[in-house]
């Protein structure tokens, strides 16, 4: 059996990209409406944006209630990262460093370097334990220049699949805040 782990796309046992029944049904429903297909608003479908905010922040989040959350629908995960990287570059001081995990999805480096950032790595995977090098990660967050950006995989860390538990997330967020760092969450899955 061959397994292609290079791209986050599902292939069937014949190596073909299948049209899933749920996708076919959704397309049939859209086609049955005979509605015109215009451009979406610049920030995407408002109902989708609101649903994403509730999913990520909780439906009763004060951030949503106070209208402090901004959500924009993007073209795929890479498109969203590119928009975020460009936005950060525009508002970050010259010389700001972006830290990506070691190892990381290699597109992280390419996207942030293309936006004009210097990219470094923070310790993440511990090959000896097959877990997170948690102390190394915290030490890097604390030692980095304040205002540095830390790209964090919210779940399904790419490429290791090793995630932080809730208690570790609490410590990482406290360390980021205490050290004056900027978290940048990649929620790919």
Regions found by a protein language model. Name each.
Residues 176, 188-189:
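Hydrophobic, well-ordered secondary-structure scaffolds
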């Amino acid at each position: 059996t061959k397994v292609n782990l290079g791209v986050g796309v599902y292939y069937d046992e014949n190596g073909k990209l299948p049209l899933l029944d749920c996708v076919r049904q959704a397309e049939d429903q859209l086609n049955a409406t005979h509605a015109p297909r215009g451009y979406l608003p610049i920030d995407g479908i408002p109902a989708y944006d609101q649903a994403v905010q509730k999913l990520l922040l909780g439906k009763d989040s004060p951030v949503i209630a106070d209208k402090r959350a901004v959500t924009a629908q993007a073209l795929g995960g890479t498109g969203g990262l590119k928009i975020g990287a460009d936005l950060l570059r525009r508002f970050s001081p010259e010389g700001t460093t972006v830290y990506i995990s070691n190892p990381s999805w290699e597109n992280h480096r390419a996207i942030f370097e293309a936006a004009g950032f210097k990219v470094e790595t923070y310790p993440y995977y511990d090959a000896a334990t097959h877990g997170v090098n948690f102390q190394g990660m915290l030490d890097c967050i604390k030692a980095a220049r304040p205002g540095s950006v830390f790209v964090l995989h919210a779940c399904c860390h790419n490429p290791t699949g090793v995630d932080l538990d809730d208690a570790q997330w609490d410590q990482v967020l406290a360390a980021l805040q205490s050290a004056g760092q900027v978290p940048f969450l990649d929620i790919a899955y």
